[in-house]
Amino acid sequence: MKSVRSFIRNDILAMSAYKITDVPPGFAKLDAMESPAHPFEGHEALMREWRAQLASAPIHLYPNPSGCGLQEALRSAFDIPDCAAVALGNGSDELIQFITMLTAKPGAAMLAAEPGFIMYRHNAALYGMDYVGVPLNGDFTLNLPAVLEAVRKHRPALTFIAYPNNPTGVCFTRAEIEAAIEASDGIVVVDEAYGAFNGDSFLPQAGRIPNLIVLRTLSKIGFAGLRIGYATGCPEVIGELQKILPPYNMNQLSLTTAKLALQHYGIISANIDSLKNERERMFAELGKICRLNAFPSQANFITIRVPDADLLFDTLKQNRILVKKLHGAHPLLEHCLRITIGSSAQNDAVLDVIRRLYR
């Protein structure tokens, strides 16, 4: 009798699953770019309104993401152009998956800068696309000549550019991204998962550049648990994407919460500003520590390089602080760690451990 595993695709059998770290109680969780607090914390009237709306949400009915008013709320909050179409996803991860599926013709290639978000490469493998990774410069800036040469040589059907980049936090220049879009015949996805922490966006160009899709999420601005992502671009492309998205891919409670949050976006914006201020404070303090290199960040995290990433990771963990160890993920990330910007107290705890280790 054949093993059940013999019916599973060999390439999937060879893959490794993405591992979510278990976090012990009482730990400062600074490994996944989440908000350090509930986004409505300190706003009791909004908390009451939220609970009332959740209590009346029609959880006995299938959701209608396109008809619940969330798209209109997104357009209003983020000034999405009228000429652009919007597709909603169960997190931007789902949209990355289906955009990859959309373009995965036999022999098609995907291009992305590396180190970058690992789900780009994962989905290329899952859907049989040839993956072309273009290494960044040593300071994590974009090697534009190499990108343009790869575009010319491989003619990718799909290119992902994270703006700002994950896991480095470095933001490529707008001119570089515009050059990559102009050089590409295929679809270029500008992934702005961390765009709220950056001073620039390609959202105003959505719907105006035929091969551009702008990808965003609510996860990094306090709502990681909702799994709300959205893609916006020309109706001709987004309309094709909507054909393959599952019809009920979001839930009533997430849709209700997201719509309410966007109606009170001033509160969310204040939370973002607070994290940006903490990021700048952290970067300045890290810059005072010898034997450590902190890379400039336009995201809600800072990536650092230290003499021994394992030692710092373990020392932080002993002090009940969990960060992301990047060492070993890519040659350019040797002895690097990524630290999510947390509360002032959490950030001070991180700084205290690092100062004691490298004093």
Curated annotation (Swiss-Prot):
Chain positions with N6-(pyridoxal phosphate)lysine modification: K220
InterPro entries membership: Aminotransferase_I/II_large (IPR004839), HisP_aminotrans (IPR005861), PyrdxlP-dep_Trfase (IPR015424), PyrdxlP-dep_Trfase_major (IPR015421), PyrdxlP-dep_Trfase_small (IPR015422)
Keywords associated with the record: Amino-acid biosynthesis, Aminotransferase, Histidine biosynthesis, Pyridoxal phosphate, Transferase
MF (Gene Ontology): histidinol-phosphate transaminase activity; pyridoxal phosphate binding
EC number assigned by the record: 2.6.1.9
Enzyme superclass (EC): transferase
Origin: domain of life: Bacteria
Keyword Amino-acid biosynthesis: yes
Subunit structure: Homodimer.
Annotated protein name in UniProt: Histidinol-phosphate aminotransferase
Gene: hisC
